[in-house]
C-alpha cells in the first residue's frame, strides 16, 4: 500500500518559498494513494480488522471521515456489523459519531436497525443520536409494496410448493431455491425470517421488486411476482435450467469466437434495453454469475440479479451520477468505481469487456490475483493479457475499447451490438471453427 510521505507533503506547501511545484505525475500518485486508502479503510472496517484500520489512521488521520457512494463512513460500516473494536478505534481518532449517510441515517440508527445492542450502548455513550430512516427518531410506518393495493403480481405463499425445493444460491440476506408455482418451476429468492423486520433489508427488497416490475425483455430474467404482505418476503422469477455463465465457463473453458459472440450479443441486447433513456438502469454488478443460461443447450442468455441496480432518470445523455461506492464484484469492477469517482452507465460496459475476455480466454481476468487485488491492479492502469488464439483482432479491439480507463471513450451497448453483428458476419460457424484453429 502506498502512502504520502510527510516530507513530500510539506514540500508542496512550501512551493512559494522556493521548492519546486509537484509534477502532474506526482499529483496522480497522490490521488491513487488517497483512493486506495479510502477503499482500504472501508474494506477493513467491514472485515472487522481493527489493527489494519488503526494503521491506516496513524498514517492518515483524515481517513476517519472517508465516505463511500452512499456517503457512509467507516463508522457506519462497523456499527452496522457490530464491530466493537473497530468502532472504538474510529472514535478514538475523532470519527463523527452522528455523521449521516445519503438517507440521513446515523451510525446509531444503523446499529439499531441491525439490533446490535452492545454497539447501541457504545455509540450512545459517545453522544450518538438515532436519526434517519432506520433510527428511533424516524416515525415508523408500514412498508407498502412498490405498487399499491391488490396488484396482480402479489403471490399467495400457499401457491408456492417447496416440497421438492432445491437450493440454487445463497447470500447474506437469504437464499434462492427452485420451487413450483401453479405447477411451473420458478426461482424463489427468500429473505431470511430473521431479517424480514430489518428496515435496510426491506428497503433493498422493495427496490429490487419495484425495478423488476418495470422490466420486459427477452434477454432479461422475467419477474413473475413477489410475496410482500407476509413473511418471509419472497421474490419469484422464471427458473432457467442452464445455470449461470460462471459455472458454464468453469466446465467448458474458453469458448469459440462464434459462441462467445452469440453470448455477448444476448448480454448486450439485455443491457441496451436497461440503458435505454430516459429511465436508465445501471446494473452495477454485471458478472458471469449474474448471466443465466436459458437451458442446457446454452443457446440463449439472460441478464439477472438486480439487487444492486439503480434506476436513474436521465435529463440528458451525458449525465454523470455521484455514485462512488465500491458497489459490485471487485474482479469485474470499473476503475472509476474502485477509485470512488463519479461514474455512469459505462461501468456496465467495462464489466461486459471483462466477461467477454473471460469467455474467450477461459479464465477470469487476473485469475492469479485475489478479487480486491485484481480491482486495484485495474485501477492502476493494468489490463488482462490476451493469450487465446480464438480472440480475433476485431474482438480484441472491441474489448480494449470497452475497458478503456476513460469511461467517456467506452462505446454504448447499442454501438457494441452493431460491432458484434459485424464481427459475427466474419466468423465461421462453430462446426467449421476447428479447421481455422488446428
Curated annotation (Swiss-Prot):
Please give the InterPro entries that the UniProt record associates with this protein: Ankyrin_rpt, Ankyrin_rpt-contain_sf, Kinase-like_dom_sf, Prot_kinase_dom, Protein_kinase_ATP_BS, Ser-Thr/Tyr_kinase_cat_dom, Ser/Thr_kinase_AS, Ser/Thr_Kinases-Pseudokinases
* Known catalytic reactions: L-seryl-[protein] + ATP = O-phospho-L-seryl-[protein] + ADP + H(+); L-threonyl-[protein] + ATP = O-phospho-L-threonyl-[protein] + ADP + H(+)
Return the annotated region ranges for Disordered. Answer: 1-31
Tissue and organ expression note: Restricted to mature vascular cells. Mostly expressed in mature leaves and seeds, and, to a lower level, in seedlings, young leaves, flowers and siliques.
Principal localization reads other
GO annotation terms (biological process): auxin-activated signaling pathway; brassinosteroid mediated signaling pathway; cellular response to glucose stimulus; leaf vascular tissue pattern formation; positive regulation of D-glucose transmembrane transport; response to auxin; response to salt
Question: GO CC terms on record?
Answer: extracellular region; plant-type vacuole
Show the Pfam families listed in the entry.
Ank_2, PK_Tyr_Ser-Thr
Which residues make up the binding site for ATP?
A: 168-176, 189
Q: What induces it?
A: Induced by auxin (e.g. IAA). Accumulates in response to salt (NaCl).
Catalytic positions are 285 (proton acceptor)
The record's listing under PROSITE patterns reads: ANK_REP_REGION, ANK_REPEAT, PROTEIN_KINASE_ATP, PROTEIN_KINASE_DOM, PROTEIN_KINASE_ST
ANK repeats span which residues? 36-65, 70-99, 103-133
What is known about what this protein does? Answer: Serine/threonine protein kinase which may function as an adapter protein for BRL2. Required during vascular development for the establishment of vein pattern in foliar organs. Mediates MSSP1/TMT1 phosphorylation and activation to enhance its carrier activity and consequently vacuolar sugar accumulation, particularly in response to cold.
Spell out the family assignment given in the record's similarity comment.
Belongs to the protein kinase superfamily. Ser/Thr protein kinase family.
> By what name is this protein known?
Serine/threonine-protein kinase VIK
- Organism lineage: Eukaryota, Viridiplantae, Streptophyta, Embryophyta, Tracheophyta
> Gene name?
VIK
Amino acid at each position: 500500500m502506498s502512502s504520502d510521505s510527510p516530507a513530500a507533503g510539506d514540500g508542496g506547501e512550501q512551493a512559494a518559498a522556493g521548492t519546486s511545484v509537484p509534477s502532474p505525475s506526482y499529483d496522480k500518485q497522490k490521488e491513487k494513494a488517497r483512493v486506495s486508502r479510502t477503499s482500504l479503510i472501508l474494506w477493513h472496517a467491514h472485515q472487522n480488522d481493527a489493527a489494519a484500520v488503526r494503521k491506516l489512521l496513524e498514517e492518515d488521520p483524515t481517513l476517519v471521515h472517508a465516505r463511500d457512494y452512499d456517503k457512509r463512513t467507516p463508522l457506519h460500516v462497523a456499527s452496522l456489523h457490530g464491530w466493537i473494536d473497530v468502532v472504538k478505534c474510529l472514535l478514538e481518532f475523532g470519527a463523527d459519531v452522528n455523521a449521516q449517510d445519503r438517507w440521513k441515517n446515523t451510525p446509531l440508527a444503523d446499529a439499531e436497525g441491525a439490533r446490535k445492542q452492545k454497539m447501541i450502548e457504545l455509540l450512545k455513550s459517545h453522544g450518538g443520536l438515532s436519526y434517519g430512516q432506520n433510527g428511533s427518531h424516524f416515525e415508523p410506518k408500514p412498508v407498502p409494496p412498490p405498487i399499491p393495493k391488490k396488484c396482480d403480481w402479489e403471490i399467495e405463499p400457499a401457491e408456492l410448493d417447496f416440497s421438492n425445493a432445491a437450493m440454487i444460491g445463497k447470500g447474506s440476506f437469504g437464499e434462492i431455491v427452485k420451487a413450483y408455482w401453479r405447477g411451473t418451476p420458478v426461482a424463489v429468492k427468500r429473505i431470511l425470517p430473521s431479517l424480514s423486520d430489518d428496515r435496510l433489508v426491506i428497503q433493498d427488497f422493495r427496490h429490487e421488486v419495484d425495478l423488476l416490475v418495470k422490466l420486459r425483455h427477452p434477454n432479461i430474467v422475467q419477474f413473475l411476482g413477489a410475496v410482500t404482505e407476509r413473511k418471509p418476503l419472497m421474490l419469484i422469477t422464471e427458473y432457467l435450467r442452464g445455470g449461470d455463465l460462471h459455472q458454464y465457463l468453469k466446465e467448458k473453458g474458453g469458448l469459440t469466437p462464434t459462441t462467445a459472440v452469440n453470448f455477448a450479443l444476448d448480454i448486450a441486447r439485455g443491457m441496451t434495453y436497461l440503458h435505454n433513456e430516459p429511465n436508465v438502469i445501471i446494473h452495477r454488478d454485471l458478472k458471469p454469475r449474474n448471466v443465466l443460461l436459458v437451458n442446457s443447450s446454452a443457446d440463449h442468455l439472460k441478464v439477472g440479479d438486480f439487487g444492486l441496480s439503480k434506476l436513474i432518470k436521465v435529463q440528458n445523455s451525458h449525465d454523470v451520477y455521484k455514485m462512488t461506492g465500491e458497489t459490485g464484484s471487485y474482479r469485474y469492477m470499473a476503475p472509476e468505481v474502485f477509485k470512488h469517482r463519479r461514474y455512469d452507465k459505462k461501468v456496465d460496459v467495462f464489466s461486459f469487456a471483462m466477461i467477454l475476455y473471460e469467455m474467450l480466454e477461459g479464465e477470469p481476468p487476473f485469475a492469479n490475483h485475489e478479487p480486491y487485488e485484481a480491482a486495484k491492479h485495474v485501477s492502476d492502469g493494468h489490463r488482462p493479457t490476451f493469450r487465446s488464439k480464438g480472440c480475433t483482432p476485431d474482438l480484441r479491439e472491441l474489448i480494449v475499447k470497452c475497458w478503456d480507463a476513460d469511461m467517456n471513450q467506452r462505446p454504448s451497448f447499442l454501438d457494441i451490438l452493431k460491432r458484434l453483428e459485424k464481427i459475427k458476419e466474419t466468423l465461421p460457424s462453430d462446426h467449421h471453427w476447428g479447421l481455422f484453429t488446428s
